């Protein structure tokens, strides 16, 4: 095992001492399933201490009120509830407790906004009389800043390079597979040519960013169309992201962030770019929502999330207290 691999494993083990529930989420991630249209999704019918899924891989909620209007909380892993110690402490479950609505968890780990709305379409919920709330935003920007192509029609998704390699293997056969395996060995031992610059040249960050906004606008239009057809409302909420908050970090948060940096050293460049794009991205999202007619809310401005309370399990995912705080802000600011 390389020194980097040992450091990464040690960082994960230390993290698990602080947030032991993350062991369950790591296991869930290792068991993800490839599914049509969405590309990948959570494993079906899972029962772990911190998280469970139904027969479709959708996370279960607690406190359902079948006689009440159904509402959807749509998004990626923060909506799914990575970091929560149980299904009862996710945002949708907390909203079931705090409102008179019946909230469903439409969160998908590592999803972009297109995958998020596709999940809504595929589920084909017949009676959605409550609001549609999309809590998202960080994954879209992160993926747009990563190397690789970004289509203004199809967008891009996490693990796309893995999918492209598998498609290439299927197309060219064993000889090309051998070449790719050898290239992988060369890369592992630092013998491969640097390809990052070439990958980025195929689609500059500026072009990827513009394409991402175009795709996001289309996704918001779809969300608004569904809301109008069902006679309800749609909202987009920019999720809280620790580097975008003027937050006093707790001892636990400082420790967790340091361990994450130790586990994934190369992510520091992405963090710097996310910070650089912050203000422009917030402005662009607000403009798109106003244009489409979707209500907009930025939780990174919320003073309640800037207090010296332990709210984050990592920079994107929250603790039980963090998810409860977000649920209460949604109820207040969206009049749920």
Locations of regions flagged by a protein language model:
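Interaction-surface signature
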Residues: 9, 19, 114-200, 204, ...
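Generic structural signal for helix capping and beta-alpha/helix-loop junctions
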Residues: 81, 113, 141, 244-246, ...
């Amino acid at each position: 095992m390389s020194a980097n691999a040992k450091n990464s494993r040690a960082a994960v083990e230390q993290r698990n001492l602080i947030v032991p529930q993350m062991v369950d989420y790591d296991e869930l991630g290792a068991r993800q399933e490839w599914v049509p249209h969405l590309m990948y999704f959570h494993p079906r019918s899972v029962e772990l201490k911190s998280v469970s899924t139904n027969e479709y891989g959708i996370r279960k909620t607690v406190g359902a009120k079948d006689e009440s209007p159904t509402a959807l909380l749509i998004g990626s892993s923060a909506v799914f509830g990575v970091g929560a110690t149980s299904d009862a402490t996710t945002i949708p479950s907390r909203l079931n407790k705090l409102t008179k609505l019946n909230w469903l968890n439409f969160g998908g780990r590592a999803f972009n906004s297109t995958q998020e709305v596709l999940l809504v379409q595929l589920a084909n919920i017949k009676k959605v009389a409550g609001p549609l709330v999309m809590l998202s935003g960080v994954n879209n920007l992160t993926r747009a800043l990563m190397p690789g192509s970004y289509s203004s029609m199809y967008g891009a998704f996490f693990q796309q390079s893995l999918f492209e390699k598998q498609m290439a293997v299927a197309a060219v056969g064993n000889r090309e597979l051998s070449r790719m395996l050898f290239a992988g060995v060369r890369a592992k031992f630092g013998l491969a040519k640097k390809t990052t610059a070439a990958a980025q040249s195929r689609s500059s960050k500026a072009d990827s960013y513009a394409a991402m906004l175009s795709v996001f606008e289309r996704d918001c239009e779809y969300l608004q169309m569904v809301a109008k057809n069902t006679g309800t409302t749609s909202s987009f909420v920019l999720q809280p992201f620790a580097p975008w908050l003027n937050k006093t970090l707790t001892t636990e948060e400082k420790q967790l962030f340091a361990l994450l940096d130790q586990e994934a050293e190369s992510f520091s460049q992405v963090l710097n770019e996310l910070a650089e794009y912050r203000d422009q991205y917030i402005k662009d999202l607000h403009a798109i929502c106003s244009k489409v007619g979707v209500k907009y809310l930025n939780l990174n401005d919320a003073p309640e999330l800037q207090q010296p309370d332990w709210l984050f399990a990592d920079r994107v995912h929250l603790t039980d207290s963090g998810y409860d705080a977000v649920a209460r802000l949604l109820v207040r600011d969206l009049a749920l």
